[in-house]
């Protein structure tokens, strides 16, 4: 199953919500046609995060006896934050959420893959493998991208 899975902005932190609005292109240029053509606000994406999490939990809880794969755009863990960005708490809230508890409570999730970051990650949270293998911007960065990466779900 999958969804965009916007982040929770550091657990809905007011300072993060305010700061990312001015720092991210998503909130300067994007319009939300559902609300009458206006700029997208961090509060909008936090609400979409909540909706996606509710959907994920519903589907996962209905399928406890099946192996599941989750695909989301934004990262489910701060473990997917590259070392050079770890000190930027506010901006990291716009890229990563801490969904470790949700993942640990649902061991049927065998693989969770995501994007939104420009560096590769492959690690475990409990019984769940978290994988991100982005190419990044062509000719601009060394992301660790593996064009032949295959992930086997057991």
Write out the residue ranges for each language-model feature.
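Bulky hydrophobic/aromatic packing residues
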Residues: 6-9, 55, 95, 112, ...
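Binuclear metal-dependent phosphoesterase catalytic core
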Residues: 82, 87, 91-110, 118-154
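Hydrophobic/aromatic beta-strand patches that form the interior of the parallel beta-sheet core
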Residues: 1, 69, 111-113, 131
């Amino acid at each position: 199953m999958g969804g965009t899975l916007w982040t929770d902005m550091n657990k809905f932190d007011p300072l993060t919500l305010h700061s990312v609005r001015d720092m991210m292109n998503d909130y300067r240029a994007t319009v939300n046609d559902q609300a009458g053509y206006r700029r997208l606000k961090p509060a909008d994406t936090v609400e979409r995060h909540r909706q996606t999490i509710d959907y994920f939990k519903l589907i996962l809880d209905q399928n406890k006896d099946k192996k599941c794969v989750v695909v989301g755009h934004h990262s489910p863990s701060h473990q997917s934050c590259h070392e050079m960005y770890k000190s930027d708490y506010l901006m990291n809230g716009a890229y990563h959420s801490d969904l470790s508890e949700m993942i640990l409570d649902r061991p049927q999730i065998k693989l969770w893959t995501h994007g939104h970051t420009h560096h590769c990650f492959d690690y475990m949270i409990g019984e769940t493998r978290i994988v991100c293998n982005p190419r990044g911007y062509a000719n601009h960065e060394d992301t660790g991208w593996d064009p032949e990466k295959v992930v086997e779900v057991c």
